[in-house]
Amino acid sequence: VGGTCGNVLSILAYLGWEAFPIARMNSDPASQRVKADMQRWGVRLDFAACTPATHTPIIIQEIRRGRDGLPVHRFSWSCRRCGHWLPGFKPVVAKSVEWILPKLDGASVFFMDRLSRAALNMSAASADGGALVVFEPSVRSDGRLLTEALRIAHVVKYAEQRFPELAGVMAKGAATLLEIQTLGATGLRFRHKLGARPSTWQHLPAIAVPALADTCGAGDWCTAGFLAMAAKRGVEGFQMAGVEALGVALRYGQTLASWSCGFEGARGGMYAVERSVFNAQIKSLSSGRRRAQSFEHRPRPRIPTAAVPCPACPL
């Protein structure tokens, strides 16, 4: 169970936050699997069944070894059995989430990775209520929606691999307080606008891992870790924290990202080790002790699960 938004929310719940996805899941097997997994980690599903309901998106991830022996992942969007396209993302409808808007008041964070009219309406309502609005684009968006998003979002984070740059982030009229560009194996760079004008870019190198199993989802761990440290008191607390505190929070996010690369799957580590082991390993990474023996663990028993059927496949 993954996807940028789903991963970030699940990881935040794992770290002790109350996380609420706003979605339109139906009762198909994929949706039931997603709901069960989210509930396992403490994610709240109060807003997960908005109408009209639809099939839950399904993506297939493969992990292979490159010529250099390192793991690489790729995704496919078609069923290997029937050949049909698997269900894709469908945003919630603006009309159907109007009842949620008043409930967003007092939220610490509103996170969005795909733009739609409903997402922008909810992000604006959240910002009015004091939330830190975080925008992490996963695909290219309609220009008008993007312009509107940048007038609302306080934190904009994106991968250099997808967006060499994102025009307008620090432009006049943008709400951006922090821009983060991840650089893969070389770390990330960031600039802020906590003062009168945008700062220069600052680089934070990546944290090395003792063993590399899969990089998928590392950026989501970075986001969740950063928010867990920097966004507890919404946008007001974020602004008051100062540049040094933001750097510490980003470094914590990078530590979680590094740790996650030691496991297959975007959130594989959550299933593989107990929380006490996670805490010890993060402490070890944070202190600079990256010896492989520091990461020895007894994996949790894995319960075999059947593949989720494609909705288009004949029964």
Predicted features and spans:
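Catalytic beta/alpha-barrel core
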Residues: 110-116, 136-138, 159
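A conserved, positively charged/aromatic
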Residues: 147-151
